[in-house]
Amino acid sequence: MNDKIFYNLSGKTLVSTPYVITKGIYHKSLIYMLSHTEEGAIGLMFNRLVNHIDLKSFFKIKNDEIVNPVMVPIYLGGPVEHEKGFFLHSTDYNKNLLLDFHNDLAVSSNLEISEDIAFGKGPKNSLLIVGYTGWKAGQLEKELEENLWLVMDCDKEFIFADNPENKWHNALKHLGIDEAHFSSQVGSA
């Protein structure tokens, strides 16, 4: 019999603790949780700026009305399926949504949103994210027990804020945590 209580973290933000391997992909990362069930979890990192790309070239938009390049930042969402692109965006845009959440965020993964963004008709706020982060059943729960992640309520202004390199430090401040208070030793007493 399993007496553990399952807490659904869909729509929450995971904040990596300093116990996550330094130099690893998840070091100082923030992940918006798309789905969390007893079967596993999926999320998108939103503070790993990779590059800036031209939407027209990246999505092979065949529209002659878009003359100038439309440069947008591109973020690494995680180590799974880098060939897949997702837009994490505000819900003022609601065409062909992949996922729609109650906290004013949505996810789209289609050519139409990239064209609408290029024409200035897209969502007010959006992040282009490639790849995602996934956990199999019980894996995220184990990582939470090992103090690898902190859980924070979603804040869309925080997600879409500029300066991705400062978001992790700002998340700790938001949670009232001073990074210096983390022990350099991993484990439990």
Curated annotation (Swiss-Prot):
Disulfide bonds: none annotated. One of its GO terms (cellular component) is cytosol. Pfam families: DUF179. Belongs to the UPF0301 (AlgH) family. This is UPF0301 protein A1I_00140.
